[in-house]
Every structure is written in C-alpha cells, then in structure tokens.
A protein has these predicted regions:
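TRNA-binding/sensing appendages of the translation machinery
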Residues: 1-77, 82, 137
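Hydrophobic transmembrane signal anchors and adjacent membrane-proximal interface regions, especially
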Residues: 75, 156-158
Length: 224
C-alpha cells in the first residue's frame, strides 16, 4: 500500500497552498521582468540531444536522455540557457540587444547547487547582444529586485562583476569549473544564506555554438 504513494527521489506534487504561493511569486516575478522590458519566450521541455553534446559544464550529465520511437536521441530540459541560445540564434539578424525571459520546469538526473529536487520550476532572464558593463549591472540589479520577493535581506555574491555600490552585493573569487560561463558569475542567496535562490552570469561564447555572434548575460531563479 505504501508504494502507491511514493514518488521518485527529488520529485513531489505541489498541493493547493504551495501552488498558490508559487503562482503568487511567479506573478510578481513576471511583473518585474515586463516592467524592465523583457518579453517572454516559451521553450519545449523535450529536444534533440545532439545540439547540446559536448557543452562545457554539467548539462549532458544532468539530462535525461532516451531514444524516441523514430530512433532519435532526445533529452528532457535540464538547463534553460542553452535552449534559449539554440532557439534565438537563427532569428537574431542584428535585432539586438534583446531582452527575454522564460519560465517552466526543468528535470535533472541529479541534484544541483540550486537544491535537491530533480524537478523544479524556474524563471529566468537574458540580455542578448550587449557586452557592456551597463548590461551586467542591469542584470545584477534585476536579480536583486526579484530576490526581494523571496527574501527580506538578500545577498548577491559576485565573481568578476563590475563595481556595484549596493550593500546587497559582495565580491568573492569563485573557484571550480565555470561551465559555459565566460566572465562574470553570481549567486543570489536568501535570508538563510545556504542554497542559492538563483545563479547567473555572462556566457559570451554560447550563442556562437549555434551560429550567432552574440554576447549574453542572464540568470535563473528556482521557485520551489
């Protein structure tokens, strides 16, 4: 009988109250993003695996991959950022800079620094085609504003960031594999200062993988 109510490790339902809280947070995030001039894009939760093969970082290792009925190797969405680059790259056509946001579930084979759940809801934003320090600061300040929806006293830990005169920001040299990030990286913490609420950075080489010469910077919040 107990087995009828088990879920895979890292997956669980959200019932009425939790769903209502998530929707409220999502609505407030979307309002901030739209106010800052970001437009929404919607991405599939399933895609071919080949375009993401060999990406730096943990995208392949975190992705569920399987062969579909047509014999194609496909994967479930485990990271929005490469999917955004693949979707936007063919249609940029010099129409830059571009501000976009996205939201939806990601499904991973393993837990990440953003928490132990393998299925999580995320919402994030990118500025594409702007390599300036002003774009860096705009993204950092937007992330800080969104963090205040979840935390009374957020902290943004940055590595390689321009100087931001704001007590919410602290600089820290991060070690370890940067994955597809190429410069600035940052992590957003809530009041408990433990698991990051969000992470982001600059990935100026990612779009080139999909045929577009476009720098980009962005972040993703995980909303549990």
């Amino acid at each position: 009988m107990a087995n009828k109510f088990r879920y895979p490790t890292g997956a669980r339902p959200l019932l009425i109250e939790e769903t209502a809280r998530r929707r409220q947070t999502e609505s407030r995030f979307v309002a901030l993003l739209e106010e800052a001039g970001f437009a929404e894009v919607v991405l599939p939760i399933i895609d071919f695996a080949e375009p993401y093969a060999g990406l730096p970082g943990r995208v392949e290792k975190q992705s569920y991959r399987f062969t579909d009925r047509e014999g194609e190797l496909v994967s479930l969405r485990s990271d929005f950022t490469p999917m955004v680059a693949r979707a936007l790259a063919p249609s940029l056509n010099g129409n830059l800079p571009l501000r976009v946001f996205y939201r939806g579930d990601v499904i991973r084979c393993e837990a990440s620094r953003l928490g132990a759940n393998r299925e999580v809801f995320q919402i994030g934003a990118e500025i594409v085609g702007d390599a300036s320090a002003e774009a860096d600061v705009a993204i950092l300040r937007l992330a800080a504003s969104m963090a205040e929806v979840l935390s009374e006293n957020p902290l943004i830990v940055t590595s390689g960031a321009p100087v931001v005169d704001d007590p919410r920001f602290v600089e820290h040299d991060e070690e370890g594999d940067p994955g597809y990030y190429t410069g600035l990286r940052f992590w957003v913490y809530g009041d408990d200062r433990r698991t990051p609420l969000a992470q982001g950075g600059r990935y100026d080489s990612l779009y080139a993988r999909f045929g577009a010469d476009a720098p980009a910077i962005g972040f993703t919040f995980t909303v549990n």
